[in-house]
Amino acid sequence: MQKEIVMTEALRRKLINAGRVLTSQDQGDFVAGHVTVRLPDDPGRFLMKPATIGLEEMTFDNIITVDLEGQKVGGTMPRHNEVFIHSEVLRARSDLQAVVHTHAPHAVAFSSLGRELVPVNNEAGYFYQQLPVFSETSDLIVTQDRGKGVARCLGRHSAVLLRNHGIVTAGRTIEEAVWIALKLERACRVQLMAEWAGGPKFVAEGEDLQKKNARGNRPDLYTNVFNYLVRMWCRDHGKADDPCCAEHHVQDESAYQK
């Protein structure tokens, strides 16, 4: 029991930091947007950012617990109406542990063009021909049926564009789900820049694309980028003594020559 409590506290810290990271990278939208993580000892339930607050305002005390029916089973604050994005993706994909939904502005703008995301920059290669677009509605996902539709659209992928709405990303860890959200927004932003300049004339392809994808999708990057952005947030906000900041000074050096 003590081990489970410690593990849940660690997940709460990561969830808090995920909200801080997403906001610091301009994926906050006032009190919209949410991130979740499955409870390892109870896979039918997950921790979730509550409604009515910003992503960066999560604390140990206000995070809520929700089941796969979308019902709040723990916590005092209200749950988001779009809970079904998370409950249905986690129900459909037992391999996934974390889900992010934001109204990432460049991704929303890009989704309105009806164009394919192509490998203009390093990040975009990850999504090339691997980025489904959910177009059943551009409205909020406030029913189980709509949530199931998002989960079907996601399929075996790790990201989906919600047309004229936002993004959904998912991963085996919080760090991975956040990293994919950051990569997708950056890829959309860079392609929009190319479109504004007349459209991309050159993109990565063939062996170059394969090598870039292999390097850009290493698990150590999920951890190192997440930890870096947490440290940056803590420095910028004078929170060096915050317990949520303390554990992010370790780097994963497994992919580098010593």
Stretches with model-predicted labels:
Residues 1-258:
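Glycine-rich flexible loops
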